[in-house]
Amino acid sequence: MSFSSNRRAVQDESLPLEHRASHARSCALHVANKLGVQREVVISAVAEKTGINLHGPVLGFELLQALAYLEALRHGEAQLNA
């Protein structure tokens, strides 16, 4: 799936949170591939910058906050501290 397809699934409030979180992790993988780093580097950056652990239980609004940060990384509007 593409980043855009995964983004839509993260935003789809009809899906279970666990499913949406899985798609958020897939978005992190797309960002990692674009930046040439491992997925865990991106997931750690999300946790550091937003306080949201994509591996743990999350709320819907947290997924959207994490997604916004992933979008910023993807578009070069935010930087990794790697």
Per-segment meaning from a language model:
Residues M1-A82:
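Alpha-helical propensity feature that highlights long, continuous alpha-helices across diverse contexts
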